[in-house]
Amino acid sequence: MSSLLLSSISTFFIVLSAVLVAIGWALVKNKKIEAHKKTMFAAAISALTFFIIYVSRTLFIGNTAFGGPDEYKIYYTIFLVFHIILATTGAVFGIVTILAGYKNNLVRHRKIGPVTSIIWFFTAITGVMVYLLLYII
């Protein structure tokens, strides 16, 4: 498989995870707790699928160097740096939030859940921008 195809598939899964997080957030706001749990679990699986594809692509194919126009390289670099920071932070917050929910530590889960969600939304947005700048533009 090509780097472009694997990157396209992994980008789909990270966007899917963000969409599912948004749906899960709306569900919990409407007191649909069981649907929230299932949707957030699906979001976590989608994010994990992204991560597995990303790591596999990196290990077996390698990183893709920026090959676009020089005037876009600074934007690519800025989005990439922010994406790496957000993705790392979001992953840690995500694990802590999920564990708090499954351990029924709802005070902690409710406190950090919205923060985690917002970080994840920005992670997905910056990830899509990195993808677009690397493969499309």
Language-model-detected regions and their locations in the chain:
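Alpha-helical membrane insertion/targeting regions
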Residues: 1-137
